[in-house]
Regions:
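Donor nucleotide-sugar binding/catalytic pocket of nucleotide-sugar-dependent glycosyltransferases
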Residues: 1-36, 112-115
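Nucleotide-sugar donor-binding and catalytic loop/hinge architecture
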Residues: 30-50, 77-80
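Conserved donor-binding/catalytic core segment of Leloir-type glycosyltransferases
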Residues: 44-61, 67, 85-89
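Nucleotide-activated donor-binding/catalytic signature segment of Leloir-type glycosyltransferases, i.e.
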Residues: 95-160
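Short alpha-helical segment that forms part of, or immediately flanks, the ligand-binding pocket
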Residues: 158-159, 181-186
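A short hydrophobic beta-strand element within the catalytic core of glycosyltransferases
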Residues: 168-169
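Aromatic "clamp/platform" in nucleotide-sugar-dependent glycosyltransferases that forms part
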Residues: 173
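Short hydrophobic beta-strand element within catalytic cores of glycosyltransferases
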Residues: 190-194
Length: 195
């Protein structure tokens, strides 16, 4: 059943619709066993609580607000398990994430990111330790970088990355219904978005 057909049946014969920009077949919630397996493969605790953000590291993305909110949430709720922020972004542009984290009292150990290998194209979720890291998968030297417009992950890999998360948060100062928000919804994540 299509939106075009529904609108036509309502008497709007001149209306046509276009398909959305997200290929929904790539984004879905993985079974819990697969989600745990991904965490274990990346040395992340089974019961850790992960808040994720998939974004281009631009100043219009409200990284300071997310860090401040995370710090307040931890201070007020005192979680009894490990918590992480997972930033799927390129660290060499935009916000100085570690510097901002320090301002809010957040340890660098609590911030994970996506590295992708320029040689084998496999990804790894781990703490940020700079660009040009050695790849544990293909043993490529200085071949791992944080995901960016020139070297990123495939849709099936991005789906796995969403499945590391327990909640998705997308704060920004301008823009619209951005693509990662919709992808996160397709993976059945609770999504927190700027109004």
């Amino acid at each position: 059943f299509s939106a075009t057909k529904a609108l036509n049946e309502m008497g709007h014969k001149h209306v046509k619709t276009v398909h959305g920009c997200i290929e929904s077949k790539y984004f879905f919630r993985l079974p819990d066993e697969e989600r745990l397996k991904l965490r274990r493969q990346n040395n992340i605790e089974d019961d850790a609580f992960i808040t994720g953000f998939v974004f281009r590291n631009q100043l219009r993305k409200s990284v300071p607000n997310l860090l401040e909110g995370y710090a307040k949430w931890k201070n007020e709720n005192k979680p009894n398990k490990k918590t992480y922020l997972l930033f799927h972004t390129y660290w060499k542009e935009g916000w100085g994430i570690h510097k901002l984290a320090e301002e809010y009292g957040i340890s660098h150990e609590e911030i994970l990111t996506t590295y992708v290998c320029r040689k084998c194209s496999r990804y790894q979720i781990k703490k940020y330790t700079g660009e040009d890291q050695n790849c544990p998968h293909c043993k490529g030297e200085k071949s791992q970088v944080t995901t960016n417009v020139g070297c990123g992950v495939r849709e099936n890999q991005l789906n796995e990355i969403y499945n590391f998360m327990d909640v998705y948060c997308h704060p920004f100062t301008s823009g619209g219904q951005e693509i990662p928000i919709q992808e996160a919804k397709l993976t059945e994540l609770i999504t927190l978005v700027t109004n």
